[in-house]
Curated annotation (Swiss-Prot):
Protein name: Cysteine-rich tail protein 1
Disordered, as annotated region: 28-95
InterPro entries with a match to the protein in the record: UPF0574 (IPR018904)
Quaternary structure, from the entry: Interacts with components of the late cornfied envelope (LCE).
Organism listed in the record: Mus musculus (Mouse)
Biased composition annotated in UniProt, kind: Polar residues: 80-95
Lineage: Eukaryota, Metazoa, Chordata, Craniata, Vertebrata
Bias type Low complexity, positions: 64-74
């Protein structure tokens, strides 16, 4: 065996990091859990604390849309779609109308098991989406 191969296979074998040094609050949480009588009472508390925040944010985000003016309501989703297009391919956001992308549920058809918004598996040079992802017209025909 080549000694360089062994180094490449396990480059972190010589590194040892104690858990207490990673997060000081983690050590405190681990000490509290065994001292409590049941761990099931301790675990739902963080989940219950975390769940209301996103629900409140979603309700706050969704509430102005239906109550707002139709012109404002129509422009907000289009702006969100344009923001989504620019990270995938900044060159195509101005060339294609926003109607070619879908919002909400993905379309039903071939390739639905593929991640729809993946930008790292190009199927063509214009949109950089997976094959048959149906995000853009060029993906549908390829």
């Amino acid at each position: 065996m080549d000694p360089h191969e062994m180094v490449v296979k396990n480059p972190y074998a010589h590194i040892s990091i104690p858990r207490a040094h990673l997060r000081s609050d983690l050590g405190q949480q681990l000490e509290e859990v065994p001292s409590s009588s049941s761990s099931s009472e301790t675990q739902p508390l963080p989940a219950g604390t975390c769940i209301p925040e996103p629900v409140g944010l979603l309700q706050t985000t969704e509430a102005p849309g239906p109550k707002g003016i139709k012109g404002i309501k129509g422009t907000a989703p289009e702006h969100g779609q344009q923001t989504w297009q620019s990270p995938c391919n900044p060159y195509s956001s101005g060339q294609r109308p926003s109607g070619l992308t879908y919002a909400g549920l993905p379309p039903v058809g071939r390739g639905d098991d593929i991640a729809h918004h993946c930008c790292c598996c190009p199927c063509c040079s214009c949109c950089h989406c997976p094959r048959f992802c149906r995000c853009h017209s060029c993906c549908v025909i390829s």
